[in-house]
Amino acid sequence: MSIFNKVTKSFQWGDKTVVMETGEIARQASGAVLVNIDDTVVLATVVGSKQAKPGQDFFPLTVDYIEKTYAAGKIPGSFFKREAKPSELETLTSRLIDRPIRPLFPEGFYNEVHVVIHTISLNPEVDADIAAMIAVSAALSVSGIPFNGPIGAARVGYVNGEYVLNPGQTARKSSQLDLVVAGTEAAVLMVESEAQQLSEEIMLGAVVFGHEQGKVAINAIHELVRDAGKPVWDWQPPAKDETFIAKVTALAEDKLRAAYQIRSKQARTQALREASASVLESLKGEGVEFDAVKVEALLFDIEAKIVRSQILAGEPRIDGRDTRTVRPIEIRNSVLPRTHGSALFTRGETQALVVSTLGTERDAQRIDALAGEFEDRFIFHYNMPPFATGEVGRMGSTKRREIGHGRLAKRALVACLPSKDEFPYTIRVVSEITESNGSSSMASVCGGCLSLMDAGVPMKAHVAGIAMGLIKEDNRFAVLTDILGDEDHLGDMDFKVAGTTNGITALQMDIKIQGITKEIMQVALAQAKEARMHILGKMQEAMGEAKTEISSFAPKLYTMKINPEKIRDVIGKGGATIRALTDETGCQINIEEDGTITIAATEAAKADEAKRRIEEITAEVEVGKVYEGPVTKILDFGALINLLPGKDGLLHISQIAHERVEKVGDYLQEGQVVKVKVLETDDKGRVKLSMKALADRPAGDSGRPAPAERGERRERRDGGASEQQQQ
């Protein structure tokens, strides 16, 4: 009899079979589920603390997604030969899993929960992120931890006008869409996508399609829970002290309402701090015992109620706008004198200084992903220091939020970048957030597009982004355009849309409540389009099209094509020729397998010199053409003349002069530069040369060779030097 109480559930999902197992591996975790989708295997474990820490005022959920290199049959390439810090993909996948599950833990549940996902086998054609989301949903559901799930998840592609479920790497190459959607049976909770300028209708259809497909996984998880679920924790939210709540509300409400009439963020924040301090002082003065953490939580609830009720009642928003108005926009291009491209994009109290840098192919980011190595020639980095929100904070390594915002901005812009053939540069864009009050990632999209155009990148279209919010109470709702930071915190949805005048290039949605309908998403998309068109108009006014010339400080790229068989000649023995070329011309030279050569230089003259020398190295000797070159070797029967780099020809003794030549050394010396004409070449690449063909014939010379010369000196019937001597 086995020591394991193993339970397995399998289901067909599109063209793939999904197998879920629990009860055999990681049995000491609160919940553990192994998911196998066509040889991609992930293990999701969940552990929850039975008690919340004293004074805990937020839900401490941690999600760690970890890819093991052995999953793809690889050994880590680092010095220590073991997995190191999380890659960007691991960080993004951790966020992707965190976002849909976080809203499903009950309000007031502050016990620490740690979710760990290991990818332990990988089929490159089956993405591990979807398998991981299903595994986490199942692990939480069987664990007994309070969780209002399960969730389902699906990836959606769009190929030939049809939606495709969970397309693999190969299928995605021909897809116009890469969208991941997650949600419960009742509602969508999270969307992450990039698209090739698709319409709002197609995007919404993809969300609905993915949500429906995710329900297949939810049904299977319900079956797994019925057979293997642990008892649900006997957890109850802390009882509310209604008397104390009423006391705090009476002390705070008027002060908070007054604070939310202040339109400036800094002044409003200061007023809110003073209101909070006043409430605490009043409670102390009245001798009321209280927990400061709980009072702060109550004040937040009161603030949310005030702001939400005002908006639903049709009153002005926090900064005085109505629900559809975009904050004032200011744009300045070419902000920095020596960068390749720059733009300052300001929308209300959100500001991004975005800088673009152009580099060569060698500057491309080489990524050793689990599914295979690849090069990325478009890099986008987002930085948000503490001063952007007027706060004191630590500066350290890049945070998960910064990585996520940078990836969203990159996804928004990548659809409108020129192809490598059109613009062979590696591009790095850095968005420095200098002020933030809502939607800094979308400001990065707008500023990034303008910065790229300022750098001379021929974008296919202007790209703008906008963040939408939602306030929903029962059947009443209001969609907010261009949300502020406070509206993000106090609202029910963060809905970011980026795109061009033709369609959407990126869509990200995070919903904190259940019950968001298709109709609400439709309204949000329509309102976002209206705002996007407004911002695009402002951007087009500021910069109608990309600069036609790149910065004088950027490297100039020149391309040329050579016969692939000549690549080794350009590289030379041990790379000697290519090293000499780069050192002597000051250029970077990159050679591809198809014979395409890219020359990067700061000055056109240097590039021209490098190009000329490469042309010399790869040139073919032409019959009938006159060349000038040095004598490289004297032979008894002639001399070897260098015609082109690495290419010599034989000047036979009979072709040196019209008169009879007894000794080659009487006419030629090594190093002497002479003009010669190419008489012929053979299929082995041997070249026959003549000097006398270029010299005037002496008077009285009949032109007939002397008997000893007929047949070009009978001692050499092969007509010249051996093949080895010519080479």
UniProtKB/Swiss-Prot annotation:
It comes from the Bacteria. Its cofactor is Mg(2+). SMART domains: KH, S1. Residues 624-692 form the S1 motif domain. Residues 555-614 form the KH domain. One of its GO terms (biological process) is mRNA catabolic process. GO terms for molecular function: 3'-5'-RNA exonuclease activity; magnesium ion binding; polyribonucleotide nucleotidyltransferase activity; RNA binding. It holds the Pfam family S1. Its EC number is 2.7.7.8. Keywords: Cytoplasm, Magnesium, Metal-binding, Nucleotidyltransferase, RNA-binding, Transferase. InterPro entries: ExoRNase_PH_dom1 (IPR001247), ExoRNase_PH_dom2 (IPR015847), ExoRNase_PH_dom2_sf (IPR036345), KH_dom (IPR004087), KH_dom_type_1 (IPR004088), KH_dom_type_1_sf (IPR036612), NA-bd_OB-fold (IPR012340), PNPase (IPR012162). Residues 691-727 are annotated as: Disordered. Belongs to the polyribonucleotide nucleotidyltransferase family. This is Polyribonucleotide nucleotidyltransferase. The gene is pnp.
